[in-house]
Amino acid sequence: MDKKDYKNVFVFAEQREGVIQPVAFELLGKARDLADVLEEKVVAMFLGYGIKDKAQELIEHGADEVIVVDTPELKDFLSEQYSQAVSQIILDRKPANTALRGNL
């Protein structure tokens, strides 16, 4: 494991029925503070179905980038499917820090 391969601050941007939850904006704010100190980017992980058009809202609240996983399998929140999707993003992108709500 080479630490230089791990970078940026990732946030799980929670949504319910296409509505971004306030906790996502709170996490983005804290992530922005940390990323600024570390001179890194804030990357939001945004999962669900029919949500692509909401990604810009996350940029407006502090994300530098949004990874959108928009698929019918994620229409309803099922922790196993969401956990697998988030785990795959983390394995692929190697964030230095990750902010998730405790009940993912």
Q: Model-derived features: where do they sit?
A:
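N-terminal glycine-rich FAD/FM-binding segment characteristic of electron-transfer flavoproteins
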Residues: M1-L104
